[in-house]
Amino acid sequence: MRSPRTLEVWKLGTVNYLKSLKLQEKLVSERKAHQIPDTLLSLQHPPTYTLGKRRTDHNLLIPESELTKIGAELHYTQRGGDITFHGPHQAILYPIISLRSIGFGARNYVETLERSMIEFASIYGVKARAGNKCETGVWVGDRKIGAIGVRISSGITSHGLALNIDPDMKYFEHIVPCGIADKEVTSLRRETDTLLPSEEVIHEQLVSCLAKAFSYDDVVWKEDPSLILDTQDKE
């Protein structure tokens, strides 16, 4: 009989991308040292483009110098994947979890992230699917609704998933999302006829779907972001 699994979830609101990256690095180090339990960051970012390890420059369709004019930042990262947009009105989840402790390999981990978003979409009557061989993320037909880009270091995960609730779609016009040409991007707002609740509720629902998919027995919600963000600033 396995021991109970607990997931600690931090609701962080809107966080600058680099600040969240530094926080993830700190938490990964602490998880490796068994100083913290499996942890999940639930947040949004100001408009930000990130490039993963499979990046190709031609998938950013405007000069980097033009990004400030549209109010966006660009950052190079060590996650998997190509170029992705992160911004307001997305549900972004960054799991910092030990794959060894839950008995998952890398592929099973990514597939479970996909299932989490698919299960969430079904709450609103949206039939989503995992990407095919040349696709990444989660799709509704041929339209992409959720992106996945992860990093695994010594069995500890970081980065994660971004699901489109109702982002400004103009930001996607400046990139080839995840390096896949000729595909549309969509959102929960566009795909459902259901009246959407607050984004806080949507974040909580997505977290619950993820916790269920990974068979966590308990979710501990942390409601005060200053407790983790302020500690980071003091170090």
UniProtKB/Swiss-Prot annotation:
Catalyzes the transfer of endogenously produced octanoic acid from octanoyl-acyl-carrier-protein onto the lipoyl domains of lipoate-dependent enzymes. Lipoyl-ACP can also act as a substrate although octanoyl-ACP is likely to be the physiological substrate. Together with LIP1 is essential for mitochondrial protein lipoylation during seed development. Required for the lipoylation of mitochondrial 2-oxoglutarate dehydrogenase component E2 proteins in leaves and roots. GO terms for molecular function: lipoyl(octanoyl) transferase activity. Keywords: Acyltransferase, Mitochondrion, Transferase, Transit peptide. This is Octanoyltransferase LIP2, mitochondrial. Residues 1-32 form a transit peptide. It is an enzyme of class 2 (transferase). Its main location: mitochondrion. It comes from Arabidopsis thaliana (Mouse-ear cress). The gene is LIP2.
